């Protein structure tokens, strides 16, 4: 802790201060006794009883060993000191960071809606209107207090009741029974009256807590009323029995029956009333459930900020373009077509993985889709790991002093054309000392401060940043005992909390860095010099105490943090405008910066928050109570579909923008067509703005969903023919784009190379999303040619596999492929010789490739050109065929030994 204070100063102590405040307040509420006359203490009583028992082990008189708790009293000074001691001793168990934060905020004169809390006690007894304005007026103002103040207070008060009503009186009753039994005069009626009071107060407390439930309906008032009546009845019986216990020692059998029957009758009355209501509600759902469902809709629309989502009716049409205008139409929409995301992550990873080479000390940790200069890139970030070859005795040295960072932490691939990009062009600073996963997550690193140019770090790197702190003996010895022997008199520079999320959760524990069971995604961004992790600052609360929330969480984006990958410095950027953001800014205003201009073109709205809001919208977009109860217009995200971050131009956009896209289907629908799609903007000032494009249910033209569009592709005869020729084809992401007035899916089809490792683009399919009974699919080697083929089919120009691109058939039979190969040699004026057999003792492969479609022609040409260049002018080129592979080779004499150097081109059958 002392090291944290020295390294982070108030960034570390501020959350501790809030926790301390909350611990003191809540512990005082739960533990401090105020009855200075009685001055009872359970703890001291138990201690003295135990000591007395140990000193009297030889006697059998338990009543003498165990004193009456009712007579036990400590001195006034001891009582006062003990109350303070309890708070200090047990305050840590009651620490609640957000409660302490809120108390400080309130003390500073701010408001969290406490004045609205009394309204909650009337909600179960009032039938609200059938619109959600009631919840907006009554519930929303009190939500901040219900989130941060009420739950810890209820917990502290409940603990107090448990200790000083429950445990206190149970101990008092048990000790009284032991003493009375020893004297032969047990007062059973007195004991029963005490237990009745304890149980009655417990039941009343349970009834009180029911006001703070997350669901209220037409039966809630009966449940609360019945619970409170039972509690009051038990307390009344307790008073009655207390008075009668002065005369009687035992409870009469009649009195037992009266108490049991009373509770049973109350339960029956409440149960019958609730059952009758349920029976009536089965036939009158709108009248009974409608008002409460309306409030549920209102509260959850507030929780999900659904009123901020713009809704548009999407008019799906299928318009053919005149063949004469197709070329011009493509040129008009070139801004969209040029930005189509052709490469998905699986294909990108297959191309990037070989780039890591044989390096044994790094591994892929995460991937992100990023944008730079209005282009999309797949970026793979890496983490340092310990090579498996490191022996056990060298493990400590290598973990802490050698493998301290990733030398070149990013690999990048352009998401449209699939070309691997030199990451240093995007990230000038690629050394990752603070990042994600691997050794950064599990260990610290360090070096002696007097190393004077000599370094043990990887690649002879010598860290010169501001991250970490210097620790001198004996602190360094306590931190790591090995330093006592290795560097007994030297200061050590230690770098801790190198994992980004761990670092953030240590200094800013208010935020969620693990959401829905997954670690929050952080993005690498750069200002052109330094590289940062962009960490979303998402605040989240449990809504169990908010009426009509039905348990859906309260989530808000308060802003972002920029964490320097080299120095570990943290800068905060504000984005939210909710009550917590106001609280946070009041305490951390000096740590907040304006959003840098360079970040505006790299920032991204958190996918986790976008998905959650969309899930909330799937249900609570329905504001009509009748439709909500019928539950026939709820949406769902298609199975297996994730958010696509793309450059697109949805309807109403003047130019392509970087957006997140989620397609939605009608829940329970068998047609698997889209009910619409949700987009979220990532450009400032509209960062986080969501828009939903709804397809009317009664629309004559349907919008195909991901499942349906895959079926459309499989049914296309052109694709069926091409699929048989491709090597191990894999269908990539099917992403919906709006190109001009056409909703179109662009689906890449990948094929493995001859080695079966590196992904190659076999073809691109453009599938019309608008459906009136016939599918339209275009294939091409680029997104433009695929879209052109789609428009040609739509206009009736091309209906079969005659679709061409650049004059070459997209789907080529074996003869066409062989002719294309031979034409390459003919263009080079190379003559081919076909021997009857090949019998050369030594043969060497120059390369191999699969050639099935026009998409493979370019790479095939490159291989043949390379082969001709190595053979040289005048060499005789041999050709022979084995199965479905054509081989070309030439003879070369090395050290008087004839060698065959050849290439293999697989052309199929």
Locate each region found by the language model.
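Short, surface-exposed ligand-recognition loops at beta-strand->loop->(often short) alpha-helix junctions
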Residues: 491-494, 667, 810-816, 851, ...
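A compositionally biased, intrinsically disordered/low-complexity signal enriched
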Residues: 821, 838-840, 893
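BRCT (BRCA1 C-terminal) domain core and associated BRCT-interaction motifs
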Residues: 833-883, 887
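Amphipathic alpha-helical segments
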Residues: 814-831, 861-863, 868
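Short, well-structured beta-strand/strand-turn elements
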Residues: 510-519, 827-839, 875-876
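DNA strand-break repair and replication-stress modules
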Residues: 806-815, 843-846
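Soluble extracytoplasmic regions of secretory-pathway and membrane proteins
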Residues: 2-805, 824, 862-865, 869, ...
